[in-house]
Amino acid sequence: MAALTRNKKKGSNSQTPPLNKQTKASPLKKAAKTQKPPLKKQRKCISEKKPLKKPEVSTDEEEEEEENEQSDEGSESGSDLFSDGDEEGNNDSDDDDDDDDDDDDDDEDAEPLAEDFLDGSDNEEVTMGSDLDSDSGGSKLERKSRAIDRKRKKEVQDADDEFKMNIKEKPDEFQLPTQKELEEEARRPPDLPSLQMRIREIVRILSNFKDLKPKGDKHERNDYVGQLKADLSSYYGYNEFLIGTLIEMFPVVELMELIEAFEKKRPTSIRTNTLKTRRRDLADILLNRGVNLDPLSKWSKVGLIVYDSQVPIGATPEYLAGFYMLQSASSFLPVMALAPREKERVVDMAAAPGGKTTYVAALMKNTGIIYANEMKVPRLKSLSANLHRMGVTNTIVCNYDGRELTKVLGQSSVDRVLLDAPCSGTGVISKDESVKTSKSADDIKKFAHLQKQLILGAIDLVDANSKTGGYIVYSTCSVMIPENEAVIDYALKNRDVKLVPCGLDFGRPGFSSFREHRFHPSLEKTRRFYPHVHNMDGFFVAKLKKMSNAMQPSGNDEPAVTMEQAQVSSSDDDDEKAEAIEELEKPPVASGQPKRESNTKEDTNKRKNPRSKEIHKGKRNKNTKTESGNVEEPRKQKKKRSQWKNEIAQAREEKRKTMRENAKETPKHRG
């Protein structure tokens, strides 16, 4: 009963203040009721009242629960309290709308309002508190977001102002360095950032020299090209010959892309051995071992590209079992162009380490015969090991010079030949950076001479009458034109062959002209591959079809020469050269000694008719009979003296002069 009377007193007290306040309300305050209270002021008043009366609210709630259990009067008083709380909440919002001058009056009125407000339901208080907390948190986020927005706007404005200032200010035009500046640079260590900036400016100007050349600059295009050569040589480490050749082959913008691509490593690729497994099965196994890989490309059905691996890719159980071969993507191309068929006779003239040979064996399904030739003995070990590991059983390994294979296997004895010729390696600089400085013009000439001999030997091996074959594929890992297009053009002029499409859907066509050289128009059927375009090593591929077994093209005026006749003529020239050298090496005859009688009948016959020796031996007889039985007339040819013969003739003449002088001086000494 004590609790009941206490609540009744509180209820009566809570009802009186609103009545008094309504009577005392001024017309200004009534007008302010219709307006929305300021958000900041309302938050301030509520936050100040909340902590003062929290303990009283909890005790009143317990007493109200007891009243509800005992009688119905408690429920009526609770409803009155609930309604009073609503009225007082409205009055409290009215007080918040007062001006700053009436702060003291608001504080006095707030005390009874706070009691009545807190006597309300607990749910209302909790919701109000959560709203306050969310409002305070939201206000902080809003302030932060506004600050960030202001900062961004300021940065954008500053950037715009700076850009406008740069437009107004006239930029300094690029000028080539003078001779004095270049000499000073040579004395100092290389300044790589300044070199890079100069290279960019020169490339930009050379890309459109007519329009971008600085006004008033008297330098010509060659001056800019010369400076670019020097800067690229010092920045990337190339010798002047190699960088000069690349500048002549490519536009300057593409040249920079090529050089930058040479500085990056090519992705690792592997080839599935279809003799033992399938690409899908191999990929699943390697993925389970932690190898991140993907199919190589649409043009290859057996290639996989490896991004990274948790295990050494060249030491997995699958590698040792011969399920795949570590092989660059560019090495797939010559074999794909060769397209060998089953039960054919194929020659790989430079087979080590066996990547292409094992690919050919897989395409032939271990049928037919493959002659895997390698001239260098140390490389035969890796070739034989890979053949055994990959399960190849149709291959014969041989160790000959590629130029001598026709003597071993016979002329026109095979269906297809793959010649991946030794070259300068200018397409694989990313693997061997020593190529930048080690290769010179003489090296390119030596490689080109060897390649011309090898391709003629490869053509002579192929049988033009083969029902399924008669093809030769020539490839190099070089980008130099003398090693690629010039070699193919030489083969077209010296053998009865023609170029056919390589069967590759991508790649750039070869050069049909370069500098003063003009090649056969069909050289556009060859294919070039570059690292900056195809993301593989620089490579060249050409495919030839042998039309006849003649040694020279049918269109030439000179008759076709067989292999035996060519060997005889070369051996005869060697014999003549050896005889001339022996004669020069003979000691001069002393003046007191009698001269040897060398004017025999045989010697006189040799001097009168130097080809009598050849006719006597029967090696060369021009009056040969044709198939019809008629004797051909000897062909009149102009005598061409080679350089070594001229040197020998000069040496002989000098020797004769010295002998004459000695013969004239001898009688004077005797007298």
Curated annotation (Swiss-Prot):
Residues 129-139 have a biased composition (Low complexity). The keyword RNA-binding applies. A motif (Nuclear localization signal 3) lies at residues 594-601. It is found in: Nucleus; Nucleus, Nucleolus. It is an enzyme of class 2 (transferase). Keywords: Methyltransferase, Nucleus, Ribosome biogenesis, RNA-binding, rRNA processing, S-adenosyl-L-methionine, Transferase. A motif (Nuclear localization signal 2) lies at residues 264-271. PANTHER family: 28S RRNA (CYTOSINE(4447)-C(5))-METHYLTRANSFERASE-RELATED, NOP2 YEAST -RELATED NOL1/NOP2/FMU SUN DOMAIN-CONTAINING. This is 26S rRNA (cytosine-C(5))-methyltransferase NOP2B.
